[in-house]
């Protein structure tokens, strides 16, 4: 990883115990220019709102074609940019909210560390309460998958279901993961003909999206991110997840093997586990992934449940 930082000029991680921060005002301005171009890829109309909680000001991207339905909340590290191929499909019956995780390169502003499990759950619970008076279906990729599980463990009251796409937190990160990270980082610097080959091999279509790559490098070089390497969830913690759960991982995942996915998934009382071709949780087969996610969420709608108390609404930008 040190070699990649030297080659790319990556800013590195925030000092231990400190929230994320920008390298400079110029770095933030460069990032925000790329950020605007990427979110133009989201289906329209899409609103940007800033939500105040005790721990952070959180930027949320709201797609509300059907505002009366049950909310779907998209979770990942970095920001919500890469969710654009999934938003319209997920938003056919209710609002979709993409979260820019505080402590990473995005407009959200952390006022405290976001990575301690209890702190993360408290922040997200408060955020969910300000988004809707209905339980939310959480969809999390990688670190966002850990966030969804952590929420279901520590603050499940506002959670209707969780969908986990190649989630972190189920197994210890090993050499396979770090090798994949190194190859992926270097592949994004390759000329486009070679990058296409890497994208096929790594099952990473985002690598071929120029707007996403520009945004990624602007963030990597311009922001000291809060380290996000969650501890592996214990067997008892997984057994305590009682909400409906869909776990999707790739047969060649760098995070967990199919055997690990099935074994750890079996500990969650109401989990379905799907192993799909490729390295990720189905991102290389967008239509199939969207169909699988929407079918699961529809099957576990909580429309007949009593509404939760709603907190004050967000302010629009």
Pin down the residues of each PLM region.
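Alpha/beta-hydrolase fold catalytic core
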Residues: 1-71, 94, 134, 287, ...
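Flexible "cap/lid" loop of the alpha/beta hydrolase fold
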Residues: 149, 153, 161-188
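Short beta-strand/loop motif that positions the catalytic acidic residue
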Residues: 241, 247-249
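Acidic catalytic loop of the alpha/beta-hydrolase fold
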Residues: 252-256, 281-282
């Amino acid at each position: 990883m040190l070699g990649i930082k030297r080659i790319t000029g990556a800013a590195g991680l925030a000092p231990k115990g400190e929230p994320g921060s920008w390298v400079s005002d110029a770095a933030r301005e460069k990032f925000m220019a790329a950020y605007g171009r990427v979110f133009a890829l989201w289906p329209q109309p899409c609103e940007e709102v800033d939500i105040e909680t005790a721990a952070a000001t959180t930027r949320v991207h709201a797609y509300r074609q059907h505002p009366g339905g049950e909310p779907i909340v998209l979770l990942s590290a970095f920001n919500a940019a890469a969710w654009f191929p999934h938003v319209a499909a997920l938003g056919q019956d209710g609002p979709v909210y993409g979260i820019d995780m505080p402590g990473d390169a995005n407009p959200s502003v952390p006022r405290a560390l976001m990575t301690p499990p209890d702190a993360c759950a408290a922040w997200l619970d408060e955020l969910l309460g300000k988004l809707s008076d209905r339980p939310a279906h959480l969809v999390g990729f990688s670190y966002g998958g850990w966030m969804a599980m952590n929420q279901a463990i520590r603050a499940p009251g506002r959670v209707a279901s969780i969908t986990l796409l190649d989630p972190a937190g189920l197994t210890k990160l090993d050499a396979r993961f770090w090798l994949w990270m190194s190859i992926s980082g270097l592949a994004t610097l390759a000329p486009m003909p070679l990058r296409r080959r890497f994208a096929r091999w790594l099952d990473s279509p985002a690598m071929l999206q120029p707007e996403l790559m520009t945004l990624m490098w602007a963030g990597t070089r311009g922001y000291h991110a809060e380290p996000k390497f969650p501890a592996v969830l214990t067997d008892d913690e997984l057994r305590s997840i009682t909400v409906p759960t869909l776990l999707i991982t790739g047969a060649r995942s760098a995070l967990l093997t199919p055997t690990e996915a099935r074994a750890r998934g079996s500990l969650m009382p109401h989990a379905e586990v799907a192993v799909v071709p490729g390295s990720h949780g189905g991102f290389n087969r967008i239509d199939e992934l969207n169909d699988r996610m929407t079918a699961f969420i529809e099957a576990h709608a909580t429309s007949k449940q009593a509404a939760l108390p709603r907190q004050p609404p967000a302010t629009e930008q």
